[in-house]
């Protein structure tokens, strides 16, 4: 890769009262440029990652980044969306811009404001990232979809509740040391493993500690090429970046993967087919 991170900014994640999508964008964009010691006038392109899907009435948000500085006016700005990978998609777009030589400095911003939306509407909004034609009516919303995927996985590989609890416990332990984390409390393996009033089952085998929270927050990166980065105070070089996309109907794909794995484990399947799975 030929790109580096030379500046960054991050708000806490959680219920951020008094903030708006615009204020969050402006805050992290300005802080990231300041952290990089880069003048706004030197930015060649802006990429905003914003899923939205009904969380904010302001659907066109790319130009809101320009509010961070008058010197950003007339800069190229594009909004990208890729469901849960929206922020990563924005970074990938910035990397490709630099690799193509279309800009020397790219400002990448990711934002979401979810907590101001009623819970039922949050569920409907998130389901817009599913295959609506087949998955919009699943009980439990998006958690219900992942609950079904987890159930299919359990059918194939056995009960993995211990592994899920270890993952949740590890994440919460790391959150204690992260000043931006929404929950900074070490819940421990036993709490994450045990279904209880405070950790109820949400969907399928998934408990509350296995599911992500509704949150507000924003983050920003300043990307540049290696030559420019060497002239600045700090840089983190990208060693690699990959982007793959699966079928939108994730449940159908999960079922196909389960059947394929079962079939390919049979001795009756030719080795060529088995090796291609």
Annotated model-derived regions:
Residues 22-37, 61-62, 90, 146-150, ...:
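Short, well-ordered amphipathic alpha-helical segments that serve as non-catalytic structural scaffolds
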Residues 259, 263-277:
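Single conserved hydrophobic/aromatic residue that forms the stacking wall/gate
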Residues 7-54:
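N-terminal beta1-alpha1-beta2 module of alpha/beta enzyme domains
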Residues 40-50, 76-82, 106-111, 162-169, ...:
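Beta-strand segments within the central parallel beta-sheet cores of soluble alpha/beta enzyme folds
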Residues 81-112, 144-178, 221-227:
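Active-site-proximal alpha-helical scaffold in enzymes
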Residues 4, 16, 52-109, 113-145, ...:
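Conserved catalytic cysteine-centered active-site region
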Residues 30-44, 153-158, 230-231, 262:
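Phosphate/pyrophosphate-binding loops at sites that engage ATP/ADP/AMP, CoA/4′-phosphopantetheine
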Residues 1-22, 31, 132-136, 165-169, ...:
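Condensing-enzyme catalytic core mediating Claisen C-C bond formation in acyl metabolism
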């Amino acid at each position: 890769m030929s790109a580096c991170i030379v500046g960054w900014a991050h708000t806490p994640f959680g219920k951020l009262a008094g903030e708006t999508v615009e204020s969050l964008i402006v805050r992290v964009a300005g802080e990231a440029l300041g952290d990089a010691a880069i003048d706004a006038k030197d930015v060649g392109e802006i990429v905003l990652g914003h899923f939205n899907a009904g969380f904010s009435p302001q659907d066109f948000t790319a130009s809101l980044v320009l509010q961070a500085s008058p010197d950003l006016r007339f800069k190229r700005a594009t909004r990208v969306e890729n469901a849960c990978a929206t922020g990563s998609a924005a970074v990938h777009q910035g990397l490709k811009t630099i690799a193509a030589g279309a800009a020397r400095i790219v400002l990448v911003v990711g934002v979401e404001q979810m907590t101001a939306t009623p819970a039922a509407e949050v569920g409907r909004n998130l389901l817009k990232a599913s295959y609506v034609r087949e998955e919009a009516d699943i009980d439990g919303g998006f958690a219900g979809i992942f609950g079904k995927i987890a159930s299919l996985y359990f059918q194939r590989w056995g009960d993995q509740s211990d592994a899920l609890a270890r993952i949740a416990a590890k994440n919460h332990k790391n959150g204690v040391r992260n000043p931006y984390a929404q929950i900074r409390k070490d819940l421990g393996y036993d709490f994450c493993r045990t279904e209880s009033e405070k950790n109820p089952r949400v969907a399928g085998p998934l408990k509350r500690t296995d599911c992500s929270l509704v949150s507000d927050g924003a983050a920003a990166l300043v990307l540049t090429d290696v030559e420019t980065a060497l002239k600045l105070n700090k840089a983190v070089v990208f060693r690699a970046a990959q982007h793959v996309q699966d079928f939108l109907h994730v449940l159908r794909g999960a079922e196909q993967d389960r059947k394929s794995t079962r079939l390919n484990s049979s001795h009756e399947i030719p080795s060529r087919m088995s090796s291609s799975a």
